[in-house]
């Protein structure tokens, strides 16, 4: 299951499904029937309903793997944005990143997991890491499942007095 998708035409080079297929799944033994992408090309509302129905077939994830954006966002859940708490898939219409419209699993859905692994890489993430250590409420902090493991590459760890 994919956590989010950009609202772009099928096959567009900037869609998450394209990148995931090229880098990983095209060369993977995972059966295609076990791979579930968000069909953004259906339109925002239709794609949300379709993916919510897909997610209903699997009540809980064994593992959720998350990476974090420079601002502390995960999937397409951004700092300072309010999302419906009763949905498993949300529509983001004002993403601070292009494209503005996206579909994403909700916090509620991502938390339906036994294990949540968070991977944080790169110097541009240092400010967000600093905010996390200071207790700021960032999207990355809102998903933890039953067991949470955080992997922070040394390049992302603030050094000296960095804030």
Segments predicted by a language model, with ranges:
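Active-site histidine-anchored catalytic micro-motif
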Residues: 1-4, 10, 60, 74-77, ...
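Ligand-binding beta-strand-loop-alpha-helix segment within the catalytic cores
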Residues: 1-65
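Solvent-exposed alpha-helices and their adjacent loops that cap or buttress functional pockets
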Residues: 29, 56-58, 66, 70, ...
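Short, well-ordered alpha-helix to beta-strand connector turns
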Residues: 32, 61, 87, 113-114, ...
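A short secondary-structure junction signal
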Residues: 48-49, 75-80, 128-132
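Class I SAM-dependent methyltransferase SAM-binding "motif I" and its flanking Rossmann-like core
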Residues: 64-108
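C-terminal functional extensions of proteins
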Residues: 111-163
């Amino acid at each position: 299951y994919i956590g989010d998708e950009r609202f772009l035409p099928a096959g567009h080079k900037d869609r998450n499904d394209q990148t995931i297929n090229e880098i990983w799944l095209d060369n993977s033994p995972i059966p295609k029937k076990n791979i579930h992408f968000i069909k953004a090309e259906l339109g925002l509302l239709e794609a949300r309903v379709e993916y919510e129905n897909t997610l209903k077939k699997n009540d809980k994830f064994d593992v959720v793997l998350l990476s974090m954006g420079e601002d502390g966002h995960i999937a397409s859940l951004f700092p300072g944005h309010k999302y419906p708490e009763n949905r498993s898939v949300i529509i983001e219409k004002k993403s601070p990143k292009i494209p503005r419209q996206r579909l994403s699993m909700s916090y509620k859905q991502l938390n339906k997991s036994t294990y949540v692994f968070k991977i944080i890489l790169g110097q541009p993430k240092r400010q967000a890491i600093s905010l996390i250590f200071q207790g700021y409420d960032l999207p990355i902090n809102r998903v933890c499942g039953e067991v949470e493991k955080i992997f922070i590459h040394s390049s992302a760890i603030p050094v000296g007095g960095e804030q």
